Swiss-Prot record:
Transmembrane segments: none annotated. GO terms for biological process: riboflavin biosynthetic process. SUPFAM superfamilies: Dihydrofolate reductase-like. The keyword Oxidoreductase applies. The lineage of its organism: Archaea, Methanobacteriati, Methanobacteriota, Archaeoglobi, Archaeoglobales. This is 2,5-diamino-6-ribosylamino-4(3H)-pyrimidinone 5'-phosphate reductase. Pfam families: RibD_C.
């Protein structure tokens, strides 16, 4: 058993999620950011790859105090569990995703340096999945056992590609902002090895100056 896996990502009209520097770019409009905050609040956990942590240093928390209060009234913690897919345990000890605003799980493989793992364990939960790379299916089963029923994935492109190619995504929502980024080395929504995966378009909606496409995959 695994959670319902929902991917949310913002991209340029040419499908890029950042430029060649891989630093965070503002693509979403204010209205879309409010929608993303609501989607976070409705999730049991939020997952990103280590590349996103190193590039953006995200908090991955619910920004709206009203939404955090609603979660608490529903018997939940103010913020969802944060999950980092980090085979080699490269997460900086100063990363904001390790702060005390929410619980954090760092998923590593057996090649992660033991000393670094011990340090990270002082501020977060660390669990091993796989020999050299994190086995995503095992991680999702682990999260389901922890009570995670809805998992929101926010990137980056390598993690999203791995999940979709392994049939581990149920739904994806892509917000397209009115910009072009270009660059053959700029990261895309799905990075990594090529694959073919069909989906069905559920909804296309205008949001601010951009639009969002929601699609589902057969489970």
């Amino acid at each position: 058993m695994r959670p319902y896996v929902f991917v949310n990502v913002a991209a340029s009209l040419d499908g890029k999620i950042s430029d060649e520097s891989r630093k965070q770019l503002r693509i979403s409009c204010e209205e879309d950011l409010r929608i993303v905050d609501r989607l976070r609040a409705e999730s049991d956990a939020i997952m990103v790859g280590i590349g996103t942590v190193l590039a953006d240093d995200p908090r991955l928390t619910v920004k709206s105090a009203e939404l955090r209060e609603k979660r608490q009234k529903d018997g939940k913690e103010p913020n969802p569990l944060r999950v980092v897919v980090d085979s080699r345990c490269r997460v900086p000890l100063t990363a904001r995703i390790l702060n005390d605003e929410a619980r954090t799980l760092v998923a590593v493989s057996r090649i992660a340096p033991e000393e670094k793992v011990r340090e990270v364990k002082k501020v977060a939960e660390v669990a091993v999945f796989g020999e050299e790379r994190v086995e995503l299916s095992a991680l999702l089963e682990f999260l389901h056992r922890k009570g995670v029923r809805r998992l929101m994935v926010e990137g980056g492109g390598t993690l999203i590609s791995s999940l979709i190619s392994q049939n581990l995504v149920d739904e994806i929502r892509i917000y397209y902002g009115p910009i072009f980024i270009g660059g053959r080395d700029s990261p895309t929504v799905c990075d990594g090895e090529s694959f073919l995966k069909k989906c069905r378009i559920e909804k296309i909606e205008r949001i601010g100056e951009g639009f969002a496409v929601t699609a589902r995959f057969n489970r």
